[in-house]
Amino acid sequence: MYNRYQQMNSAYLNLEDLIKEAGLTIPSGLCSSSSASENPFPEPIQYVCAPARKLKFMLVGTHAHQTTGYSKVTYHIIQELAKHRDEFEVFHFGFQKFMAQPTDYRNYPPGIDVHDPVEVEKSGAAPKEMGFGFSQLPAYVRKVKPDVMLIYNDAGVICQFLDKLSSELSASERNYKLIIYLDQVYEIQRPQFLARIDQDAHSYFAFTMYWKQVLQKQGIKKPIHVLRHGFDPTQFKPMDRGAARKKHGIPENLFIFLNLNRNTPRKRHDIVVQAFAHLVARNPTKPLALLEVCDGGEGGGYPIQEIYMRTLESLNVPIQHHAHKLMISKQSLTYTDELINELYVLSDVGITAADGEGFGLCQFEAMGIGIPQVVPLIGGFRDFCTPDNSQLVVPKYRSYLALGSSSIGGIAELVDPFDLSIAAENYVMDSDLRTRHGEAARRTVLGYEWSKEVGNLIRVLRDVAKE
Protein backbone atom coordinates (compact mmCIF):
# COMPACT_ATOMS: atom_id res chain seq x y z
CA MET A 1 0.00 0.00 0.00
CA TYR A 2 2.83 2.36 0.89
CA ASN A 3 4.71 1.62 -2.38
CA ARG A 4 1.57 2.29 -4.43
CA TYR A 5 1.01 5.63 -2.74
CA GLN A 6 4.67 6.52 -3.23
CA GLN A 7 4.39 5.80 -6.97
CA MET A 8 1.30 7.97 -7.26
CA ASN A 9 2.98 10.73 -5.30
CA SER A 10 6.10 10.56 -7.45
CA ALA A 11 4.02 10.93 -10.63
CA TYR A 12 2.25 13.89 -9.08
CA LEU A 13 5.53 15.58 -8.20
CA ASN A 14 6.93 15.06 -11.72
CA LEU A 15 4.00 16.79 -13.38
CA GLU A 16 6.23 19.35 -15.10
CA ASP A 17 8.44 16.56 -16.55
CA LEU A 18 5.36 14.81 -17.92
CA ILE A 19 4.17 18.03 -19.54
CA LYS A 20 7.57 18.53 -21.18
CA GLU A 21 7.60 14.93 -22.46
CA ALA A 22 4.23 15.60 -24.08
CA GLY A 23 5.74 18.53 -25.98
CA LEU A 24 3.80 21.15 -24.03
CA THR A 25 5.14 24.25 -22.33
CA ILE A 26 4.19 26.29 -19.31
CA PRO A 27 4.22 30.07 -19.98
CA SER A 28 7.07 31.55 -18.00
CA GLY A 29 6.10 33.78 -15.12
CA LEU A 30 2.46 32.73 -15.25
CA CYS A 31 2.48 30.44 -12.23
CA SER A 32 4.99 29.09 -9.74
CA SER A 33 4.76 25.85 -7.80
CA SER A 34 5.96 24.83 -4.37
CA SER A 35 9.14 22.75 -4.44
CA ALA A 36 9.14 19.00 -3.94
CA SER A 37 9.77 17.66 -0.47
CA GLU A 38 11.67 14.63 0.78
CA ASN A 39 8.58 13.77 2.78
CA PRO A 40 6.91 10.67 1.23
CA PHE A 41 3.56 12.29 2.06
CA PRO A 42 4.08 15.88 0.84
CA GLU A 43 1.52 18.64 0.87
CA PRO A 44 -0.41 19.08 -2.41
CA ILE A 45 1.32 21.30 -4.95
CA GLN A 46 0.01 24.88 -4.84
CA TYR A 47 0.03 26.99 -7.98
CA VAL A 48 0.06 30.69 -7.07
CA CYS A 49 -0.95 33.07 -9.91
CA ALA A 50 -0.36 36.79 -9.77
CA PRO A 51 -3.63 38.65 -9.09
CA ALA A 52 -5.23 40.33 -12.10
CA ARG A 53 -4.55 44.06 -12.29
CA LYS A 54 -7.53 46.25 -11.56
CA LEU A 55 -8.84 48.45 -14.34
CA LYS A 56 -8.15 52.13 -13.67
CA PHE A 57 -11.33 54.09 -14.34
CA MET A 58 -11.39 57.89 -14.33
CA LEU A 59 -14.69 59.76 -14.19
CA VAL A 60 -14.53 63.38 -15.32
CA GLY A 61 -17.76 64.88 -14.05
CA THR A 62 -19.38 67.17 -11.50
CA HIS A 63 -18.21 66.80 -7.90
CA ALA A 64 -20.62 64.80 -5.75
CA HIS A 65 -20.84 67.67 -3.25
CA GLN A 66 -22.52 69.95 -5.77
CA THR A 67 -26.33 70.14 -5.67
CA THR A 68 -27.12 69.80 -9.38
CA GLY A 69 -28.55 66.82 -11.20
CA TYR A 70 -25.11 66.14 -12.65
CA SER A 71 -23.70 65.73 -9.14
CA LYS A 72 -26.37 63.21 -8.16
CA VAL A 73 -25.59 61.08 -11.17
CA THR A 74 -21.82 61.09 -10.62
CA TYR A 75 -22.36 60.27 -6.95
CA HIS A 76 -24.46 57.21 -7.70
CA ILE A 77 -22.18 56.00 -10.49
CA ILE A 78 -19.26 56.08 -8.06
CA GLN A 79 -21.28 54.38 -5.33
CA GLU A 80 -22.07 51.47 -7.64
CA LEU A 81 -18.55 51.15 -9.01
CA ALA A 82 -17.19 51.10 -5.45
CA LYS A 83 -19.07 47.84 -4.91
CA HIS A 84 -16.68 46.27 -7.43
CA ARG A 85 -13.42 47.44 -5.90
CA ASP A 86 -11.90 44.04 -6.70
CA GLU A 87 -12.20 44.94 -10.40
CA PHE A 88 -11.87 48.72 -10.61
CA GLU A 89 -9.76 51.52 -9.21
CA VAL A 90 -11.94 54.63 -9.38
CA PHE A 91 -10.63 58.17 -9.80
CA HIS A 92 -12.90 61.21 -9.89
CA PHE A 93 -11.92 64.52 -11.46
CA GLY A 94 -14.80 66.24 -9.68
CA PHE A 95 -15.34 69.75 -10.92
CA GLN A 96 -17.45 72.72 -9.80
CA LYS A 97 -17.56 72.04 -6.07
CA PHE A 98 -18.53 75.61 -5.24
CA MET A 99 -20.00 75.16 -1.78
CA ALA A 100 -19.10 73.47 1.47
CA GLN A 101 -21.42 70.68 2.56
CA PRO A 102 -22.06 68.93 5.89
CA THR A 103 -19.64 66.13 6.67
CA ASP A 104 -22.35 63.52 6.11
CA TYR A 105 -23.40 64.85 2.69
CA ARG A 106 -22.85 62.35 -0.11
CA ASN A 107 -19.67 60.88 1.28
CA TYR A 108 -17.32 59.26 -1.21
CA PRO A 109 -16.70 55.55 -0.58
CA PRO A 110 -13.30 54.61 0.86
CA GLY A 111 -10.55 54.22 -1.69
CA ILE A 112 -11.90 56.71 -4.25
CA ASP A 113 -9.27 59.23 -5.36
CA VAL A 114 -10.92 62.65 -5.84
CA HIS A 115 -9.35 65.70 -7.46
CA ASP A 116 -11.10 69.01 -6.71
CA PRO A 117 -10.25 71.63 -9.39
CA VAL A 118 -12.09 74.40 -7.53
CA GLU A 119 -9.81 74.03 -4.52
CA VAL A 120 -6.75 74.33 -6.75
CA GLU A 121 -8.21 77.36 -8.53
CA LYS A 122 -8.86 79.07 -5.19
CA SER A 123 -5.25 78.51 -4.13
CA GLY A 124 -4.03 80.33 -7.22
CA ALA A 125 -2.10 77.30 -8.45
CA ALA A 126 -4.24 77.03 -11.59
CA PRO A 127 -6.18 79.45 -13.80
CA LYS A 128 -9.80 80.13 -12.97
CA GLU A 129 -11.95 78.22 -15.45
CA MET A 130 -15.42 78.37 -13.88
CA GLY A 131 -14.45 75.49 -11.63
CA PHE A 132 -14.12 73.01 -14.51
CA GLY A 133 -10.35 72.76 -14.25
CA PHE A 134 -9.75 72.20 -17.97
CA SER A 135 -6.05 73.03 -17.54
CA GLN A 136 -5.68 70.66 -14.59
CA LEU A 137 -6.95 67.50 -16.26
CA PRO A 138 -3.79 66.65 -18.27
CA ALA A 139 -1.63 66.55 -15.14
CA TYR A 140 -4.17 64.37 -13.36
CA VAL A 141 -4.18 61.98 -16.31
CA ARG A 142 -0.38 61.78 -16.19
CA LYS A 143 -0.60 60.97 -12.49
CA VAL A 144 -3.32 58.33 -12.72
CA LYS A 145 -2.60 56.77 -16.14
CA PRO A 146 -6.19 55.56 -16.54
CA ASP A 147 -7.19 52.61 -18.68
CA VAL A 148 -10.62 54.12 -19.29
CA MET A 149 -11.79 57.71 -19.00
CA LEU A 150 -15.45 58.73 -19.02
CA ILE A 151 -16.33 62.41 -19.52
CA TYR A 152 -19.87 63.37 -18.50
CA ASN A 153 -21.31 66.70 -19.60
CA ASP A 154 -22.68 68.51 -22.64
CA ALA A 155 -20.87 68.66 -25.97
CA GLY A 156 -19.40 72.13 -25.46
CA VAL A 157 -17.74 71.30 -22.14
CA ILE A 158 -16.55 67.90 -23.38
CA CYS A 159 -14.83 69.50 -26.38
CA GLN A 160 -12.93 71.91 -24.13
CA PHE A 161 -11.59 68.99 -22.10
CA LEU A 162 -10.62 67.08 -25.25
CA ASP A 163 -8.81 70.06 -26.77
CA LYS A 164 -6.81 70.56 -23.58
CA LEU A 165 -5.89 66.87 -23.40
CA SER A 166 -4.79 66.66 -27.04
CA SER A 167 -2.70 69.85 -26.82
CA GLU A 168 -0.82 68.91 -23.64
CA LEU A 169 -0.55 65.12 -23.71
CA SER A 170 1.34 63.00 -26.21
CA ALA A 171 -0.39 60.21 -28.09
CA SER A 172 1.20 57.65 -25.79
CA GLU A 173 -0.12 59.53 -22.76
CA ARG A 174 -3.60 59.38 -24.27
CA ASN A 175 -3.66 55.62 -24.68
CA TYR A 176 -6.78 55.28 -22.52
CA LYS A 177 -10.16 54.29 -23.94
CA LEU A 178 -12.42 57.36 -23.94
CA ILE A 179 -16.13 56.97 -23.20
CA ILE A 180 -18.42 59.94 -23.69
CA TYR A 181 -21.53 60.19 -21.50
CA LEU A 182 -23.25 62.88 -23.54
CA ASP A 183 -25.94 65.13 -22.14
CA GLN A 184 -28.18 65.93 -25.10
CA VAL A 185 -31.00 68.38 -24.42
CA TYR A 186 -31.98 69.24 -27.99
CA GLU A 187 -32.54 67.00 -31.00
CA ILE A 188 -29.49 68.28 -32.86
CA GLN A 189 -25.89 68.79 -31.82
CA ARG A 190 -23.58 71.20 -33.62
CA PRO A 191 -21.72 69.15 -36.27
CA GLN A 192 -18.31 70.54 -35.31
CA PHE A 193 -18.82 69.41 -31.72
CA LEU A 194 -19.79 65.89 -32.74
CA ALA A 195 -16.88 65.65 -35.18
CA ARG A 196 -14.42 66.75 -32.49
CA ILE A 197 -15.79 64.32 -29.94
CA ASP A 198 -15.96 61.40 -32.37
CA GLN A 199 -12.31 61.93 -33.26
CA ASP A 200 -11.26 60.72 -29.78
CA ALA A 201 -14.22 58.67 -28.55
CA HIS A 202 -14.04 54.92 -28.19
CA SER A 203 -17.76 54.64 -27.42
CA TYR A 204 -20.72 56.60 -26.07
CA PHE A 205 -23.42 56.47 -23.44
CA ALA A 206 -26.75 58.23 -23.93
CA PHE A 207 -29.31 59.02 -21.22
CA THR A 208 -32.13 57.06 -22.88
CA MET A 209 -32.88 54.91 -25.91
CA TYR A 210 -34.50 57.94 -27.53
CA TRP A 211 -31.27 59.93 -27.22
CA LYS A 212 -29.28 56.99 -28.56
CA GLN A 213 -31.42 57.03 -31.69
CA VAL A 214 -31.05 60.81 -32.02
CA LEU A 215 -27.27 60.45 -31.87
CA GLN A 216 -27.26 57.66 -34.44
CA LYS A 217 -29.32 59.78 -36.84
CA GLN A 218 -26.57 62.40 -36.72
CA GLY A 219 -24.02 59.97 -38.10
CA ILE A 220 -22.35 58.47 -35.03
CA LYS A 221 -21.22 54.96 -35.99
CA LYS A 222 -19.25 53.99 -32.91
CA PRO A 223 -20.97 51.93 -30.18
CA ILE A 224 -23.66 53.81 -28.26
CA HIS A 225 -24.92 52.37 -24.98
CA VAL A 226 -27.64 53.61 -22.64
CA LEU A 227 -27.14 54.64 -19.01
CA ARG A 228 -30.38 55.99 -17.63
CA HIS A 229 -30.58 57.79 -14.32
CA GLY A 230 -31.64 55.68 -11.38
CA PHE A 231 -33.89 56.38 -8.43
CA ASP A 232 -32.85 56.02 -4.80
CA PRO A 233 -35.95 55.15 -2.70
CA THR A 234 -33.97 55.62 0.51
CA GLN A 235 -33.20 59.21 -0.42
CA PHE A 236 -36.54 60.31 -1.88
CA LYS A 237 -39.57 58.74 -0.26
CA PRO A 238 -43.20 59.49 0.62
CA MET A 239 -43.77 61.41 3.85
CA ASP A 240 -46.74 62.81 5.71
CA ARG A 241 -47.91 65.72 3.54
CA GLY A 242 -49.75 67.43 6.35
CA ALA A 243 -46.66 67.42 8.55
CA ALA A 244 -44.49 68.76 5.73
CA ARG A 245 -46.91 71.59 5.04
CA LYS A 246 -47.20 72.46 8.69
CA LYS A 247 -43.42 72.63 8.99
CA HIS A 248 -43.22 75.13 6.12
CA GLY A 249 -46.33 77.11 7.07
CA ILE A 250 -48.41 76.09 4.06
CA PRO A 251 -52.22 75.69 4.40
CA GLU A 252 -53.53 72.16 4.03
CA ASN A 253 -56.22 73.12 1.49
CA LEU A 254 -53.83 74.80 -0.96
CA PHE A 255 -53.39 73.07 -4.33
CA ILE A 256 -49.67 73.47 -5.08
CA PHE A 257 -47.90 73.17 -8.41
CA LEU A 258 -44.13 72.78 -7.96
CA ASN A 259 -41.38 73.83 -10.35
CA LEU A 260 -37.93 72.95 -9.02
CA ASN A 261 -35.99 73.87 -12.16
CA ARG A 262 -33.34 76.57 -12.11
CA ASN A 263 -34.28 79.87 -13.75
CA THR A 264 -32.29 79.40 -16.95
CA PRO A 265 -33.45 80.09 -20.52
CA ARG A 266 -33.95 76.41 -21.35
CA LYS A 267 -36.31 75.77 -18.43
CA ARG A 268 -38.80 78.38 -19.71
CA HIS A 269 -40.22 79.65 -16.45
CA ASP A 270 -41.89 82.37 -18.50
CA ILE A 271 -44.20 79.79 -20.07
CA VAL A 272 -44.94 78.14 -16.72
CA VAL A 273 -46.05 81.36 -15.01
CA GLN A 274 -48.11 82.39 -18.04
CA ALA A 275 -49.84 79.01 -17.95
CA PHE A 276 -50.48 79.40 -14.24
CA ALA A 277 -51.99 82.84 -14.82
CA HIS A 278 -54.37 81.32 -17.37
CA LEU A 279 -55.30 78.62 -14.86
CA VAL A 280 -55.96 81.20 -12.14
CA ALA A 281 -58.04 83.30 -14.52
CA ARG A 282 -60.33 80.36 -15.25
CA ASN A 283 -60.51 79.26 -11.61
CA PRO A 284 -60.35 82.48 -9.55
CA THR A 285 -61.99 81.01 -6.45
CA LYS A 286 -59.87 77.87 -6.16
CA PRO A 287 -56.99 77.90 -3.64
CA LEU A 288 -54.21 77.49 -6.20
CA ALA A 289 -50.50 78.18 -5.81
CA LEU A 290 -47.37 77.86 -7.92
CA LEU A 291 -44.15 77.32 -5.97
CA GLU A 292 -41.13 78.33 -8.04
CA VAL A 293 -37.95 77.11 -6.33
CA CYS A 294 -35.50 79.41 -8.09
CA ASP A 295 -34.45 83.02 -8.21
CA GLY A 296 -36.89 85.57 -9.55
CA GLY A 297 -34.69 86.64 -12.43
CA GLU A 298 -31.97 88.44 -10.50
CA GLY A 299 -29.43 85.96 -11.82
CA GLY A 300 -30.21 86.73 -15.44
CA GLY A 301 -33.21 84.45 -15.89
CA TYR A 302 -36.83 85.31 -16.51
CA PRO A 303 -38.46 88.05 -14.37
CA ILE A 304 -41.03 85.58 -13.07
CA GLN A 305 -43.12 87.89 -10.89
CA GLU A 306 -43.33 90.55 -13.57
CA ILE A 307 -44.41 88.07 -16.26
CA TYR A 308 -47.09 86.63 -13.98
CA MET A 309 -48.52 90.07 -13.16
CA ARG A 310 -48.55 91.20 -16.78
CA THR A 311 -50.30 88.01 -17.87
CA LEU A 312 -52.99 88.41 -15.20
CA GLU A 313 -53.49 91.98 -16.35
CA SER A 314 -53.79 90.91 -19.99
CA LEU A 315 -56.50 88.44 -18.95
CA ASN A 316 -58.43 91.16 -17.11
CA VAL A 317 -57.91 89.46 -13.74
CA PRO A 318 -57.61 91.66 -10.61
CA ILE A 319 -53.92 91.42 -9.78
CA GLN A 320 -54.39 92.30 -6.12
CA HIS A 321 -56.57 89.21 -5.60
CA HIS A 322 -54.14 86.71 -7.08
CA ALA A 323 -50.60 88.08 -6.81
CA HIS A 324 -49.94 86.01 -3.68
CA LYS A 325 -50.60 82.74 -5.51
CA LEU A 326 -47.15 82.83 -7.07
CA MET A 327 -44.55 81.85 -4.46
CA ILE A 328 -40.86 82.21 -5.25
CA SER A 329 -38.13 80.60 -3.15
CA LYS A 330 -34.71 81.99 -3.98
CA GLN A 331 -32.28 79.41 -2.63
CA SER A 332 -32.65 76.50 -5.03
CA LEU A 333 -28.92 75.80 -5.36
CA THR A 334 -28.40 75.43 -1.61
CA TYR A 335 -31.18 72.97 -0.87
CA THR A 336 -30.19 69.56 0.45
CA ASP A 337 -31.70 66.34 -0.84
CA GLU A 338 -33.68 66.05 2.40
CA LEU A 339 -35.29 69.45 1.93
CA ILE A 340 -35.96 68.76 -1.74
CA ASN A 341 -37.77 65.60 -0.68
CA GLU A 342 -39.99 67.72 1.59
CA LEU A 343 -40.75 70.10 -1.29
CA TYR A 344 -41.82 67.19 -3.46
CA VAL A 345 -44.02 65.84 -0.68
CA LEU A 346 -45.86 69.07 0.09
CA SER A 347 -46.75 69.62 -3.59
CA ASP A 348 -49.77 68.19 -5.40
CA VAL A 349 -48.41 68.28 -8.95
CA GLY A 350 -45.11 69.07 -10.63
CA ILE A 351 -44.96 71.27 -13.73
CA THR A 352 -42.34 72.35 -16.25
CA ALA A 353 -42.20 73.90 -19.70
CA ALA A 354 -38.57 73.18 -20.56
CA ASP A 355 -37.90 73.55 -24.29
CA GLY A 356 -35.27 70.80 -24.17
CA GLU A 357 -34.52 68.15 -21.55
CA GLY A 358 -31.77 65.57 -21.29
CA PHE A 359 -33.49 63.48 -18.64
CA GLY A 360 -35.64 65.53 -16.27
CA LEU A 361 -34.37 64.54 -12.84
CA CYS A 362 -36.62 66.90 -10.85
CA GLN A 363 -39.76 65.47 -12.43
CA PHE A 364 -38.38 61.94 -12.20
CA GLU A 365 -37.66 62.17 -8.47
CA ALA A 366 -41.05 63.67 -7.67
CA MET A 367 -42.75 60.88 -9.62
CA GLY A 368 -40.76 58.41 -7.53
CA ILE A 369 -42.66 59.49 -4.42
CA GLY A 370 -46.01 59.57 -6.21
CA ILE A 371 -46.34 63.17 -7.45
CA PRO A 372 -47.78 63.31 -11.02
CA GLN A 373 -46.29 65.73 -13.54
CA VAL A 374 -47.33 68.13 -16.28
CA VAL A 375 -44.53 68.06 -18.87
CA PRO A 376 -43.82 68.71 -22.55
CA LEU A 377 -43.51 65.64 -24.75
CA ILE A 378 -39.79 66.08 -25.39
CA GLY A 379 -36.37 64.54 -24.82
CA GLY A 380 -35.78 62.57 -21.66
CA PHE A 381 -39.40 62.81 -20.53
CA ARG A 382 -40.30 60.35 -23.29
CA ASP A 383 -38.60 57.57 -21.34
CA PHE A 384 -40.62 57.65 -18.11
CA CYS A 385 -43.59 59.98 -18.68
CA THR A 386 -46.57 58.36 -20.39
CA PRO A 387 -50.30 59.14 -20.78
CA ASP A 388 -50.87 56.69 -17.92
CA ASN A 389 -48.78 58.57 -15.35
CA SER A 390 -48.46 62.18 -16.56
CA GLN A 391 -50.10 65.01 -18.43
CA LEU A 392 -48.13 65.29 -21.67
CA VAL A 393 -48.26 68.50 -23.69
CA VAL A 394 -47.24 68.33 -27.35
CA PRO A 395 -44.97 71.25 -28.33
CA LYS A 396 -46.56 73.67 -30.76
CA TYR A 397 -43.49 75.57 -31.95
CA ARG A 398 -39.88 74.78 -32.91
CA SER A 399 -37.19 77.43 -32.91
CA TYR A 400 -33.46 77.39 -33.64
CA LEU A 401 -31.35 78.78 -30.82
CA ALA A 402 -28.99 81.69 -31.37
CA LEU A 403 -25.40 80.82 -30.49
CA GLY A 404 -25.14 83.99 -28.45
CA SER A 405 -27.68 82.59 -25.99
CA SER A 406 -26.78 78.90 -26.26
CA SER A 407 -23.27 77.84 -27.22
CA ILE A 408 -24.37 74.27 -27.89
CA GLY A 409 -27.11 75.38 -30.30
CA GLY A 410 -30.09 73.21 -31.08
CA ILE A 411 -33.80 73.40 -31.81
CA ALA A 412 -36.05 74.39 -28.93
CA GLU A 413 -39.49 72.76 -28.72
CA LEU A 414 -41.99 75.14 -27.16
CA VAL A 415 -45.37 74.38 -25.65
CA ASP A 416 -48.16 76.93 -25.71
CA PRO A 417 -48.91 78.41 -22.25
CA PHE A 418 -52.64 77.88 -22.77
CA ASP A 419 -52.13 74.19 -23.65
CA LEU A 420 -50.00 73.77 -20.54
CA SER A 421 -52.71 75.37 -18.41
CA ILE A 422 -55.34 72.96 -19.75
CA ALA A 423 -53.15 69.98 -18.88
CA ALA A 424 -52.59 71.35 -15.38
CA GLU A 425 -56.31 71.96 -14.97
CA ASN A 426 -57.04 68.29 -15.61
CA TYR A 427 -55.37 67.46 -12.31
CA VAL A 428 -57.10 70.29 -10.45
CA MET A 429 -60.52 69.10 -11.57
CA ASP A 430 -60.03 65.34 -11.29
CA SER A 431 -58.58 64.11 -7.99
CA ASP A 432 -59.07 60.47 -9.00
CA LEU A 433 -56.96 61.01 -12.12
CA ARG A 434 -54.30 62.72 -10.03
CA THR A 435 -54.21 59.84 -7.55
CA ARG A 436 -54.15 57.21 -10.28
CA HIS A 437 -51.35 58.92 -12.16
CA GLY A 438 -49.37 59.47 -8.98
CA GLU A 439 -49.48 55.78 -8.13
CA ALA A 440 -48.53 54.81 -11.68
CA ALA A 441 -45.70 57.35 -11.69
CA ARG A 442 -44.22 55.84 -8.54
CA ARG A 443 -44.41 52.30 -9.94
CA THR A 444 -42.66 53.42 -13.11
CA VAL A 445 -39.78 55.23 -11.42
CA LEU A 446 -39.16 52.53 -8.81
CA GLY A 447 -38.11 50.32 -11.72
CA TYR A 448 -35.12 52.58 -12.40
CA GLU A 449 -32.58 51.08 -10.00
CA TRP A 450 -29.08 52.52 -9.89
CA SER A 451 -27.52 49.07 -9.64
CA LYS A 452 -29.19 47.99 -12.88
CA GLU A 453 -28.52 51.22 -14.76
CA VAL A 454 -24.83 51.46 -13.79
CA GLY A 455 -24.60 47.74 -14.55
CA ASN A 456 -24.61 48.74 -18.22
CA LEU A 457 -21.44 50.77 -17.65
CA ILE A 458 -19.82 47.96 -15.68
CA ARG A 459 -20.43 45.51 -18.53
CA VAL A 460 -18.78 47.89 -20.98
CA LEU A 461 -15.79 48.34 -18.67
CA ARG A 462 -15.40 44.57 -18.39
CA ASP A 463 -15.47 44.26 -22.17
CA VAL A 464 -12.83 46.98 -22.50
CA ALA A 465 -10.65 45.16 -19.97
CA LYS A 466 -10.68 42.11 -22.27
CA GLU A 467 -9.51 44.06 -25.32
Q: Model-predicted segments: where are they?
A:
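A short helix/loop element that forms part of the nucleotide-sugar donor recognition site in Leloir-type
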Residues: 42, 237-250
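Aromatic "clamp/platform" in nucleotide-sugar-dependent glycosyltransferases that forms part
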Residues: 355
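Carbohydrate-associated surface elements
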Residues: 210, 230
